Amino acid sequence: MSTNICSFKDRCVSILCCKFCKQVLSSRGMKAVLLADTEIDLFSTDIPPTNAVDFTGRCYFTKICKCKLKDIACLKCGNIVGYHVIVPCSSCLLSCNNRHFWMFHSQAVYDINRLDSTGVNVLLRGNLPEIEESTDEDVLNISAEECIR
């Protein structure tokens, strides 16, 4: 597997908001495609969203691969906004992937490009710290203007 093909460092980082209630769900989102069906657009994140989503329903498996999934719903409005890959299958782990296991449906969330510390340039994945210093409250208290923008 070539490093160039699987590099995600030049991808834009996004703030992900629920389309139903405008709740901020993640500040580390990235556009993604479903490995099992590249026609399906998604957003993903590497860190579990805290105080924004929770699991709902039972675990299930896809027809295309053997990943074990569980839906996630927005805590503010209750709508299903995506799913978590509870147990990735070996086929998906061996393919080119970004190691994000929190997935958001493009029909349920919208994205806002996140800016770097200068406030001018779009923040790129390669410049995003693995674990951010901000508290959960900092992430979730993004202004309504920022979410509506």
From Swiss-Prot:
Cross-referenced InterPro entries: YPEH2ZP
| One Pfam family here | YPEH2ZP
Q: Which residues form a coiled coil?
A: none
Induction of expression: Up-regulated in gastric cancer.
The superkingdom listed in its UniProt entry is: Eukaryota
Q: Which cysteines are joined by disulfide bonds?
A: none
Q: Which GO terms describe its cellular component?
A: cytosol; intracellular membrane-bounded organelle
Entry similarity comment: Belongs to the FAM72 family.
Q: What is this protein called?
A: Protein FAM72D
Source species, please?
Homo sapiens
Q: Which gene encodes it?
A: FAM72D
